[in-house]
Amino acid sequence: MIYSAIAGLLLTLTSVATASALPEVNSLESRQAPSVSTISFSEPILSPNVILTFPNGTWVENLVPRSEDGNFVATLLSAPEVYLLSSTNAFPPLLLAQFPAKTSVLGVVELGHDVFYAVVGNFSVKTFASTPGSYGIFKIDLNGHAVGANKPGHGKLSKLTAKGVVVTKVADLPDAGLPNGLTVLNPNTGILLVADSAKGLVWSVNVFTGKTAIAINDPSMAPNATLSGGLGLGINGLSFDSGYLYYDNSNTVTFYRIAVNSTTGRATGPAQALADQEFANIFPDDFTLDFAGGIWFACEYGHIAYLAGVSTGKFQPGIVAVAGNTTGPVGLTSAKFGTTAEDLKRGSLYVSTNGGPFTYGGAHPAQGQLVRYDTALLGFY
């Protein structure tokens, strides 16, 4: 997801992030989480394992595990491209899809066996400007996929290109300002929910019929550009789980959940604030849920932050930074848990990065990465 430009508020990293004690969380093995008080940037609890580094100027925006093999489908914000990334670096990035008339690909999800849906449109990583009305939802079907010859991806990415991938537009979003995060609401009826960061609302998209509608328009989702150097970026990441839609707001630095109808996506209750401006030194972008009901945030300043028991009824407020320092990866954009047997043993959380968003407006933009954090060290898995 796109990070809110907070240059007007925070230009430097602080040296220490203060965190409350971790609540006890039951993992798959009924282990309990240790207590953590103060997190030092120079001594992070979790160390990054860099799996892949892209060329300079490559903003990796979002990723989702591929159920077929445990690798990852990843999107680029800096180019209209979608790649298959090896979770073990067993093969170079495999170009799955290109959209020549567009500039960027944002959220991506898997719906159906080896079928993915992505938000595609025009967004500038240099100016942070979106082109309203340029977006659509595209289907990327990998069921016929095979590795092809070595062909160029874009100017700086010469990579293997997939054969047999079928790409189809399934819906236009002519009234969207900046469709960003994406989640599956109802796999049976083909309903996706899309966060519109510019308009501060959620769209529903039926990928079978192409029908779109505003599902939720709640004040908690609204952007507030005055809080972040002029860039209006409200609701950002979102995820549906067990009757609730979870989402963060980049401008207001908040995290919410709201009860929704699992057929229409419309709200059936008020928004509930789960974290209100508790991200002062870390600023979350996208997030993911774990098997124990916790939320894991990928944060712009290089942190992995954790909020325990959110979807289990055992929620206790308090954000804890469990990874991040001044020399580790920055510009974390998305986080997803791995699905292979080895990933489950390690509690492997895979994170995409842009390397630092403010560099993309200059002559020497940063380089995105795929990074793995093994959370089993914390006792959560």
Predicted segments with their positions:
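Asp-box/WD-like beta-propeller blade repeats and closely related beta-sheet repeat scaffolds
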Residues: 45-48, 125, 130-188, 201
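Fungal secretory targeting signals
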Residues: 1-32
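A short helix->beta-strand "capping" segment at the edge of beta-propeller domains
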Residues: 32-58, 163-167
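Short loop/turn segments that connect beta-strands within beta-propeller blades
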Residues: 86-91, 141-146, 161-163, 206-210, ...
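Short loop/turn segments immediately following the C-termini of beta-strands
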Residues: 77, 120-123, 142, 187, ...
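Short, solvent-exposed loop/turn segments at conserved positions within beta-propeller repeat blades
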Residues: 77-78, 125-135, 197-198, 250-253, ...
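Blade-level signature of beta-propeller repeat domains, shared across WD40, Kelch, NHL, RCC1
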Residues: 336-381
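Beta-rich, blade/repeat-based domains predominating
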Residues: 53-69, 99-125, 163-191, 199, ...
